[in-house]
């Protein structure tokens, strides 16, 4: 392929991926379906359900048009291929055009089916209909959802493609093509998994993401998973009526201090171990008096007199958890991004040390 064709292909691929997954830069620039079609979609705050009925349909149609947009662009970027003349276009490009036309055609048929009887066939409307009283329809349930969404005390978090919204009555997950809805009184919530990420793109700090399974007692309501930062777990529990069950292997860190202690321990584990002389007996940690002392401060600089760290001559007196809590207590709470690289004084002799100087004893 020649240079213009390659350049356009790469540029369009990047645009298509960003348009579908919408990073923060695209949101800031207004290059989203919600912003481009805001006049037709209306306001989410004013009418949550009607907004997402139209948004999911518009998103499906716009995304299905991306292959056709690529073909039209290639007609201009690679004019020598004569793609605009179907009879002269290569066989592979004609097959691609067939696919590019088929996708939006199927999307249009599906959207038409959804919109029948005032959107009664839409998956969101059909889910709401499961909660409707015999003498009312799904519109009455939608009105209740709209009212609760407008309240300022709702719980809302997550990225635009996987938002989690909890109101007084409803648990909802808003994705690119669908809105999952379940009634609080009918659901069982279970924390099934926790994943530790070393760095958060927003704060350069470790972050723990929880996977919570939302399963309704009504078999007709499809179960779904929501993803949540562990620091928001407590706020979610306050909004829910029922307790959240937890799998046996899942440990939840609800505070920044919990996350730091786990990271602190993992970093200390890779430091060189300190061998305790056979004549020395380890005593109980003077911080908690519950476990034996398990760490020793050893300056790791090659030259003992150089660097900001200082040699500590104290015997092992602290356990790993208490030393981590001491380290965290000496940090600036407004600058958590500096915690791992900082130096603090020894709790006993005040010699300054960093995380690299904390060694486990053996």
Curated annotation (Swiss-Prot):
| Record-listed E.C. numbers | 2.3.2.27
User: Which residues belong to zinc fingers classed as RING-type?
Assistant: 285-350
- What InterPro entries would the database entry show? TM129
Could you tell me which Pfam families the record lists for this protein?
A: Tmpp129
Tell me yes or no: is Hydrolase among this UniProt entry's keywords: no
User: Can you name one GO molecular function term for this protein?
Assistant: ubiquitin protein ligase activity
Keyword Zinc assigned to the entry: answer is yes
Q: Which compartments is it annotated to reside in?
A: Endoplasmic reticulum membrane
The topology of this chain with respect to the membrane is:
Multi-pass membrane protein
Which keywords does the record carry?
A: Endoplasmic reticulum, Membrane, Metal-binding, Transferase, Transmembrane, Transmembrane helix, Ubl conjugation pathway, Unfolded protein response, Zinc, Zinc-finger
Annotated transmembrane regions:
7-27, 57-77, 95-115
Q: In which pathway does it act?
A: Protein modification; protein ubiquitination
A GO BP entry? retrograde protein transport, ER to cytosol
Q: Which residues lie on this side of the membrane: Cytoplasmic?
A: 28-56, 116-362
Spell out the reaction equation it catalyses: S-ubiquitinyl-[E2 ubiquitin-conjugating enzyme]-L-cysteine + [acceptor protein]-L-lysine = [E2 ubiquitin-conjugating enzyme]-L-cysteine + N(6)-ubiquitinyl-[acceptor protein]-L-lysine
Q: How does it assemble?
A: Integral component of ER-resident dislocation complexes.
Its annotated function is as follows: E3 ubiquitin-protein ligase involved in ER-associated protein degradation, preferentially associates with the E2 enzyme UBE2J2. Exploited by viral US11 proteins to mediate HLA class I proteins degradation.
Family assignment from sequence similarity: Belongs to the TMEM129 family.
Swiss-Prot/TrEMBL domain comment: The RING-type zinc finger domain is responsible for E3 ubiquitin ligase activity.
For this entry, the protein name equals E3 ubiquitin-protein ligase TM129
Report the source organism: Homo sapiens
Gene (name only): TMEM129
């Amino acid at each position: 392929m020649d240079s213009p064709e390659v350049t356009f292909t790469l540029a369009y691929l990047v645009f298509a991926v960003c348009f579908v997954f919408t990073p923060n830069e695209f949101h800031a620039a207004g290059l989203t379906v919600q912003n481009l079609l805001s006049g037709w979609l209306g306001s989410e705050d004013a009418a949550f359900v009607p907004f997402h009925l139209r948004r999911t349909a518009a998103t499906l149609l716009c995304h299905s048009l991306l292959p056709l947009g690529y073909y039209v662009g290639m007609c201009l970027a690679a004019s020598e291929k004569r793609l605009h003349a179907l009879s002269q276009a290569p066989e592979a490009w004609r097959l691609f055009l067939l696919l590019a036309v088929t996708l939006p055609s199927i999307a249009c048929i599906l959207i038409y089916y959804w919109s029948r009887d005032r959107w009664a066939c839409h998956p969101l409307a059909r889910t709401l209909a499961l909660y409707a009283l015999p003498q009312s329809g799904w519109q009455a349930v939608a009105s209740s959802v709209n009212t609760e969404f407008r309240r300022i005390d709702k719980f809302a978090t997550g990225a635009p493609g996987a938002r989690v919204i909890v109101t007084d009555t409803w648990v909802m997950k808003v994705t690119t093509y669908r809105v999952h809805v379940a009634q609080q009184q009918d659901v069982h919530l279970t924390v099934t998994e926790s994943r530790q990420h070393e760095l958060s793109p927003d704060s350069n700090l470790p972050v723990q993401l929880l996977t919570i399974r939302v399963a309704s007692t009504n078999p007709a309501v499809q179960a779904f998973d929501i993803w949540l930062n562990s620091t928001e777990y407590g706020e979610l529990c306050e909004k829910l009526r029922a307790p959240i069950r937890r799998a046996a292997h899942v440990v939840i860190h609800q505070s920044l201090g919990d996350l730091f202690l786990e990271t602190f321990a993992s970093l200390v584990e890779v430091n060189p171990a300190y061998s305790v002389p056979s004549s020395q007996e380890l005593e109980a940690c003077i911080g908690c008096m519950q476990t034996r002392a398990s760490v020793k401060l050893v300056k790791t600089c090659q030259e003992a007199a150089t660097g900001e760290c200082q040699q500590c001559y104290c015997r092992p007196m602290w356990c790993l958890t208490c030393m981590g809590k001491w380290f965290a207590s000496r940090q600036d709470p407004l600058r958590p991004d500096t915690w791992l690289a900082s130096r603090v004084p020894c709790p006993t002799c005040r010699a300054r040390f960093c995380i690299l100087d904390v060694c486990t004893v053996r």
